[in-house]
Regions:
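Thiamine diphosphate
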Residues: 1-92, 96-203, 208-212, 260, ...
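DG-centered beta-turn motif at the end of beta-strands
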Residues: 42, 213-223, 228-230
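A short alpha/beta connector and helix-capping loop motif
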Residues: 52, 226-247
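Active-site regions of oxyanion-processing enzymes, predominantly non-cytosolic
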Residues: 123-128, 299-305
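Active-site flanking residues adjacent to catalytic metal/cofactor-binding acidic residues
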Residues: 129, 217-220, 246, 305
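Residue-level marker for buried hydrophobic side chains located in beta-strands
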Residues: 169, 214-217, 244
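A contiguous pocket-lining binding segment that forms or flanks enzyme active sites
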Residues: 241-276, 280
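A short, acidic, amphipathic alpha-helical segment used as a generic capping/interface helix at domain edges
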Residues: 283-296
Length: 338
């Protein structure tokens, strides 16, 4: 994997979202460097604003590598279908030169020379990466790790035990929703796919318009990508939201690359954003007790739990389509309690 190689051997900056990555590369260019931005095409939408209003406006060229999940003619997950169909067209609409990177090393070397010439002339260039263009590359750990022994599956089991007719569960993008599905698939579960970082915004919109209780199960990477929503939630203070963050200091579903969460005090941030009750928990028992207390006396609450990296082997994916997940979830959310 190209990102793993870059982390191992290059001056790599782990941005929290693709738009920030583009802006950071642009700053490096202004410092006289030749920056490269790496992203999955599902995040290309996040990069549109700086690519069109920063790079194009200020004539700051960057080199980009973007994957092609959902490439037409290939089988992929449903959340990649639309972006896969429009990835290259979107680059063209932004007046960005692009090519598919060849799997042949000789041809690819010539492509890189060509791209450098275009960038030298002040124009950005993106390589679109088809599946299997790069081989596997092991990630060398280069950040300090934490000794954490509780895993996500254990915590999710504790959380989902608190199911009720007036409780909705929102599972963030990646392994969280997949594990929730395997533990207990319910019509009041929303399994987010794609839209990384948007789970808390989704829950906010529902919670402000429903009396049902919303339990958000978030991750460190997801929260960091859209951390501004903590302030929005804190401002509107919906009492029926319980926001749980499971922090494994990694992007687990994309290969375990580190996040920048290691030295962040999310509990204090949530408190300063206006959450009424903010607690760090360290074991399953305290998680169970905290949920029991919240269900009895709902108030805007933030729970933070450090967990270990990794998930169960051969983890499956929800067999219920996103469309059906949305429909049954809406039906449940609008069902009147007896």
């Amino acid at each position: 994997h190209l990102i793993n190689f870059a982390i191992n051997y290059c001056d790599f900056i782990m941005s929290t979202n693709e738009g920030d990555a583009v802006a950071t590369c642009s700053g490096a260019y202004l410092a006289g460097k030749k920056p490269v931005v790496l992203m999955q095409n599902s995040g290309l939408g996040n990069a549109v604003s700086p690519l069109t209003s920063l790079n194009d406006t200020f004539k700051i060229p960057i080199l980009g590598f973007v994957s092609h999940r959902g490439q037409p003619g290939t089988k992929d997950e449903p959340q990649h279908e639309l972006m896969g169909a429009i990835t290259t067209e979107l680059l063209e609409l932004m007046n960005i030169n692009w090519e598919y990177l060849s799997k042949d090393n000789v041809i690819a070397s010539k492509q890189l020379i060509m791209a450098n010439e275009i960038i030298t002339k002040g124009k950005s260039f993106f390589f679109v990466i088809s599946k299997n263009t790069f081989g596997d590359h092991a990630l060398i750990s280069n950040v300090k790790t934490r000794n954490v022994f509780i895993n996500r599956n254990e915590i999710l089991n504790q959380i989902l035990r608190h199911k009720a007719d007036d409780v909705l569960f929102f599972g963030t993008t990646g392994k969280t929703g997949r594990e929730m599905f395997e533990i207990d698939d319910m019509e009041n579960n929303f399994y987010m796919v794609g839209s990384m970082g948007c789970i808390s915004s989704l829950a906010l919109g529902l919670s402000l318009n429903s009396r049902k209780k919303s339990i958000i199960i978030d991750g460190d990477g997801s929260l960091l990508m859209r951390m501004g929503n903590l302030a929005t939630i804190g401002f509107y203070k919906p009492k029926n939201i319980l926001h749980i963050v499971l922090d494994n200091n990694s992007h687990d579903s994309t290969g375990g690359q580190f996040t920048v969460s290691n030295d962040i005090n999310f509990v204090e941030i949530a408190k300063n954003c206006g959450y009424d009750n903010c607690i760090e928990l360290e074991d399953k028992e305290s998680v169970d007790q905290a949920l029991t207390n919240w269900v009895k006396n709902t108030t805007l609450t933030f729970l933070y739990i450090r967990i270990s990296k990794g998930s169960k082997k051969n983890l499956g994916r929800p067999s219920v389509s996103p469309t059906d997940v949305s429909k049954r979830f809406k039906d449940f959310a609008n069902k009147k309690n007896d």
